[in-house]
Amino acid sequence: MEALLGYLLIFVARLTDVSMATIRMIMVVKGKRVIAACIGFVEVSIYVVAIGKVLSGMDNPLNVLAYASGFATGNYVGIFLEEKMALGNIIAQVISDYEVEKLVEKLRNVGFGVTVIEGYGREGIRYILNVSLQRKHLSRLYQTVEEHDKKAFVTVTDARAIRGGYFAGMKK
């Protein structure tokens, strides 16, 4: 029973510290220094406990298996948490040629700020709709665009910061 608890401790510790590492890296990229440092402190403290437990029992391959399993699961959980948290802002470009004025109106009615640029593509004139939004609202953007123009081309990029312009909250 004691050995099983040891494996579980190693697994859970590694799962936790790797998940935290994923979130910490996102905070680093987004310039959230203090939050990243705090997460890093807790993360490395947990890591030291896990690696200490493994190194003290290197003769037991199940310790290594628990460590590796916790690492792999921690990556999965970290990515899952990051997707659910949907932190930060993004910029979406919607390229369409189908009743663009109506699409712009729909997007604005939902609460998105939209800037329209005329462009020229392989098939002629296209309109590029630049939309800055919070990541948590991306599915709403996709849904609104899809309802209007199933053939619209949408690209999304991360935005480190957004300043000025129209950046309203979503309407119900």
Swiss-Prot record:
UniProtKB keywords: Cell membrane, Membrane, Transmembrane, Transmembrane helix
Superkingdom of source: Bacteria
Location within or outside the cell: Cell membrane
Keyword Transmembrane helix in annotation: yes
Membrane topology: Multi-pass membrane protein
Membrane spanning residue stretches: 3-23, 34-54, 61-81
InterPro entries to which the protein is assigned, alphabetical: DUF2179, DUF5698, N-reg_PII/ATP_PRibTrfase_C, UPF0316
Main localization category: membrane
A Gene Ontology cellular-component term: plasma membrane
Family: Belongs to the UPF0316 family.
Protein's name according to its UniProt entry: UPF0316 protein Clos_0555
Organism whose genome encodes this protein: Alkaliphilus oremlandii (strain OhILAs) (Clostridium oremlandii (strain OhILAs))
